């Protein structure tokens, strides 16, 4: 089972309320604005600020 792409249309970053992009390779939802990656565990996004991973500029998707 994979992350439902319809879900990406309605979920938002819990901090800035901006769009999240799915990084399938790392199984994370990425917020470019806040430079954070939220884990996706068992196809469920974990959108908790304390579980977010800070991203370096070079890790951000294009």
From Swiss-Prot:
<comment type="similarity">
    <text>Belongs to the UPF0434 family.</text>
</comment>
<dbReference type="InterPro" id="IPR005651">
    <property type="entry name" value="Trm112-like"/>
</dbReference>
<dbReference type="Pfam" id="PF03966">
    <property type="entry name" value="Trm112p"/>
</dbReference>
<dbReference type="GO" id="GO:0005829">
    <property type="term" value="C:cytosol"/>
</dbReference>
<protein>
    <recommendedName>
        <fullName>UPF0434 protein Tola_2233</fullName>
    </recommendedName>
</protein>
